[in-house]
Amino acid sequence: MLNPYLLRNQIDAISKKLLKKKFKLDISLISSLEKKRKKLQIKTDNLQYKHNTLSALFKKEKKIQELDENLKRTLTKSSKNLSELKIELNLLQEKIHNFSLSIPNIPSDDVPEGNSSENNKIVKYWGKKREYSFAVRDHVEIGNKLNQLDWKSSAKISGARFIVMKGNIALLHRALSQFMLDLHTIKHGYTETYVPYLVNHDSLYGTGQLPKFTDDLFHINSIDKKKYVLIPTAEVPLTNLFSNQILNETELPIMLTAHTPCFRSEASSYGRDSKGLIRLHQFDKVELVQIIQPELSMNALELLTHHAEKVLQLLELPYRKVLLCGGEMGFSATKTYDLEVWFPSQKKYREISSCSNMSDFQARRMKTRYKKKKEKSNSFVHTLNGSGLAIGRTLAAILENYQDSDGRVTIPKILQKKYMQGIEYIN
């Protein structure tokens, strides 16, 4: 949620910045609502002052047993009018609040203009693409030939966009999650956290998935007469651990990681990547979350992105780092880097991680603040998150980049001894 002060006092400037995200702010509507709110607030405050004066006089007369019936009637009427005004004001404030929930975060000044991936800025390339002397297979064909990716069984028991993994590919999938968690906890300093896979609607409002992306979520409607949603990412439960809290500055930065399944309906991606591990309804991911002071958040974004990059570097997978343009960015983000890994079968880079600084956007929705050491007032924290990494896509990238002409797949060296029980090849 944006700072209400900006919407009240810098509406034109904010509207212009939001155009970078392809969002047209209805200035006339928000100005009209704010004008009504101010007028109603003044009216309510004035009546409250008069009511308080009458109440004090009534208490004084009651004490000396000289009650004035006119005063009593006036006080009763004042109380009724004040109650009606407060209800009207609350309804208007709720309307403004709901409207504010539909407004995305403001993009950082260094975010490129543009509405498509062609306008993204390539920051760097890493790794050398392998040259093949044979016809390159995609990861679906490789998995089928190895008889370890079972699409027929998953379609039978669940439907499209699900997968059953078997044998050493299933072992590799597990190995990747363990490797990523070890790297982020032991080397990068994150605290491993186990979180629920079902969350309430308040949590999804807090991190910004609701109300805008309700169609992309899997909703569970009948547990203890409460509504739950399967998590689309561990960002939701990890970040909401600190909702409605005031943290001490000494607690910051907070760095958390979790390995969870993620569930997405992919309603907005209908028809895209219907084949393979790229876009499933259920997939696993290791998530990175940081909560930090505002002045440190942009440096923290660089660090968090580096932590995700390190996974790709140690697996020796060629990738590129991309700064997203305004039109490609997520709803809650102020700045986002995508890491895109090379897929030789497609001869292009595909997203494997998205690392974002959310500034105070989520913190305002969650009411997460921190107490500065020498200041009386509390400030909103900044939140960051990123994939470190998406496990299914990492697995697919390994199958393609490490394939041999005879159909076998070499296991990345860093995984062989510690995580893959000494296995060097899948064949």
From Swiss-Prot:
Residue numbers binding L-serine: T233, A234, E235, E287, S387
Subcellular location(s) of the protein: Cytoplasm
Reaction(s) catalysed by this chain's protein: tRNA(Ser) + L-serine + ATP = L-seryl-tRNA(Ser) + AMP + diphosphate + H(+); tRNA(Sec) + L-serine + ATP = L-seryl-tRNA(Sec) + AMP + diphosphate + H(+)
Top-rank EC class of the record's enzyme: ligase
Documented EC number(s): 6.1.1.11
Gene Ontology terms: cellular component: cytoplasm
Family statement drawn from the similarity comment of this UniProt entry: Belongs to the class-II aminoacyl-tRNA synthetase family. Type-1 seryl-tRNA synthetase subfamily.
Protein name: Serine--tRNA ligase
Gene responsible for this protein: serS
